[in-house]
Amino acid sequence: MSAFQPTIKRRESTKIYVGNVPIGGDAPIAVQSMTNTRTTDVEATVAQIKSLERVGADIVRVSVPTMDAAEAFKQIKQQVNVPLVADIHFDYRIALKVAEYGVDCLRINPGNIGREDRVRAVVDCAQDKNIPIRIGVNAGSLEKDLQEKYGEPTPEALLESALRHVEILDRLNFDQFKVSVKASDVFLAVESYRLLAKAIKQPLHLGITEAGGARAGAVKSAVGLGMLLAEGIGDTLRISLAADPIEEIKVGFDILKSLRIRSRGINFIACPTCSRQEFDVIGTVNALEQRLEDIITPMDVSIIGCVVNGPGEALISDLGVTGGNKKSGYYLDGERQKERFDNEDIVNQLEAKIRAKVARQDPKNRII
């Protein structure tokens, strides 16, 4: 890794816990996703949650729209280890039911679950059971009076909506909550979060909502969340993609990894290739990404097809390969090794070296 280190001053915030996962304060920025199965299909939902756990999800959100879904949630909760957030709208009784079943966090908007006595019932229950709440404001579901006041979703409108819900919880002396102000427009979301970050001390849940498909959504999320994270704003995040939820976790960690905020697994540094490449760089990277998904120890690996930039990148990598005629140069911890890799077998040889280094460096293969 380069000796140059960015200076990101994290916004000060209070710390809450979603299950055993700390959010805010000096805690690592948590990466989460949401199931897209029918919650009443317990087997499919449990399988998806476990697949998200395997790729590093810190928290998983589950939609609970009905009492039948709440009963299914009880079974789901018993079969998984990762903390679960129940996403609930309108019916306060569902929130009370999942609280009974051990939910780790409630995603509600106090303003849309009815009269104040209902809100108080949910908040009192959350207080008694030490369950945090996420207030989730979305530009697509802004209150009618705010749409009329501002004409359209604006940063000020999203902030006002969020502060309304915050005020309800403040009035009930409840402070274990986090807040999000999501929009599908990058600039609208970013400015809304900036305003909110100045207005409250609670942790912020980041996201660009309905960002799009796997490619466009990942780019949009990286731009928006990257701007905020580089300013020190954000305590947990979800990448919203019209794709397999596993991709949301991978993209989330890739964004944090790119900003050197939190690393998980291999950070591949690879050239885009040209006619100078001495081995199949693209095929090598694709193969290693798939083979090494189980590695969670942070590590920089450079895979460069020729000697133009290869040696320089290898010097600041944990492991590096620089393309050569029939055999390629191998670097370990920035030092050129006598050993060379056969270009026809470079994937197998590099995988073996990476796994050996992980075993030496971090026997528990832990995440940072």
UniProtKB/Swiss-Prot annotation:
EC number per UniProt: 1.17.7.3
Cofactor: binding comment: Binds 1 [4Fe-4S] cluster.
SUPFAM superfamilies given in the database record: Dihydropteroate synthetase-like, Nitrite and sulphite reductase 4Fe-4S domain-like
Keyword Signal: no
Gene Ontology annotations of biological process type: isopentenyl diphosphate biosynthetic process, methylerythritol 4-phosphate pathway; terpenoid biosynthetic process
Keywords: 4Fe-4S, Iron, Iron-sulfur, Isoprene biosynthesis, Metal-binding, Oxidoreductase
Domain of life of the organism encoding this protein: Bacteria
Leading EC class: oxidoreductase
Catalytic activity entry: (2E)-4-hydroxy-3-methylbut-2-enyl diphosphate + oxidized [flavodoxin] + H2O + 2 H(+) = 2-C-methyl-D-erythritol 2,4-cyclic diphosphate + reduced [flavodoxin]
InterPro entries: Dihydropteroate_synth-like_sf, IspG_bac, IspG_bac-typ, NO2/SO3_Rdtase_4Fe4S_sf
Co-factor requirement: [4Fe-4S] cluster
Residues given in the record as [4Fe-4S] cluster binding sites: C271, C274, C306, E313
Single GO molecular function: iron ion binding
Pathway: Isoprenoid biosynthesis; isopentenyl diphosphate biosynthesis via DXP pathway; isopentenyl diphosphate from 1-deoxy-D-xylulose 5-phosphate: step 5/6
A Pfam family per the record: GcpE
Similarity comment text for this entry: Belongs to the IspG family.
Function statement: Converts 2C-methyl-D-erythritol 2,4-cyclodiphosphate (ME-2,4cPP) into 1-hydroxy-2-methyl-2-(E)-butenyl 4-diphosphate.
Protein name: 4-hydroxy-3-methylbut-2-en-1-yl diphosphate synthase (flavodoxin)
Gene source species: Haemophilus influenzae (strain 86-028NP)
Organism lineage string: Bacteria, Pseudomonadati, Pseudomonadota, Gammaproteobacteria, Pasteurellales
Gene name, Swiss-Prot/TrEMBL: ispG
